[in-house]
Amino acid sequence: MTLVDFTAAWCPPCRVLGAVLAALVPAYAGRVRFTAVDVDAEPALAERFGVRAMPTVVLLRDGREVGRVVGSRPRAFVAGMLDRALAGDMAIAGP
């Protein structure tokens, strides 16, 4: 599974979420690949994924989107989302 964090350097909530995601990396090592996309550097990729606000987190399994969350979220929320996705619960997208 891959978690893609669509972010921007000028976005304060993106920095908060970035710290949350960085703290979760060790707990999900070998199960989730964490990556970040700077929407200013990669606007075509952000457009391809329909990103309209930052931060936006997209979860991919085998190249297919299985979840999406817009906005900064606390660590427990993100961990719960990842746990559900890893367990195969496809209804994980949040507002």
Regions found by a protein language model. Name each.
Residues 2, 49-58:
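Structural micro-motif
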Residues 13-28:
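Typically the conserved alpha-helix immediately C-terminal to a functionally engaged Cys/Sec
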